[in-house]
């Protein structure tokens, strides 16, 4: 396979990208920029509900993956940024159910990081991802 240069992907189903790209593809790899629980206009849905925001954020990751020609099954790494670790831990059942909508087996590596705040003050969680086409 011939190497290809980076290609940015910004699907219409995600908020307009200003100063960043939702996904960057280079060769067999895609990097998904941080996705929050927002609709296609950028409005955060369900302020205060980490499970609902997680479900939307992971859906947004899947939208970016598919727009770039990948699937959730191609994901090799997820990074979660949360503003309240206690809320995250207390919601693991609901978070797990939303997670399994996209990742049913072969769970990717992941990292969970607590941060002071995210780009939108109503955002409770942000997810970025890396995916590689599997042979």
Q: Predicted segments — roles?
A:
Residues 1-59, 63-76, 82-135:
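N-terminal presequence-like segments and the immediate start of the first folded domain
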């Amino acid at each position: 396979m011939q190497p290809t240069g980076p290609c940015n992907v910004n699907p219409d189903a995600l908020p307009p990208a200003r100063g960043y790209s939702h996904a960057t593809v280079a060769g067999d790899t895609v990097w998904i920029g941080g996705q929050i629980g927002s609709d296609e206009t950028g409005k955060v849905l369900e302020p205060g509900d980490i499970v609902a925001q997680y479900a939307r954020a992971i859906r947004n990751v899947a939208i970016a993956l598919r727009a770039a020609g990948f699937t959730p099954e191609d994901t090799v790494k997820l990074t979660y940024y949360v503003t309240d670790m206690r809320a995250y831990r207390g919601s693991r059942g609901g978070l797990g159910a939303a997670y399994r909508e996209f990742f049913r087996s072969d769970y990717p590596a992941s990292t969970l990081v607590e941060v002071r705040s995210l780009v939108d003050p109503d955002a409770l969680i942000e997810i970025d991802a890396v995916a590689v086409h599997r042979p």
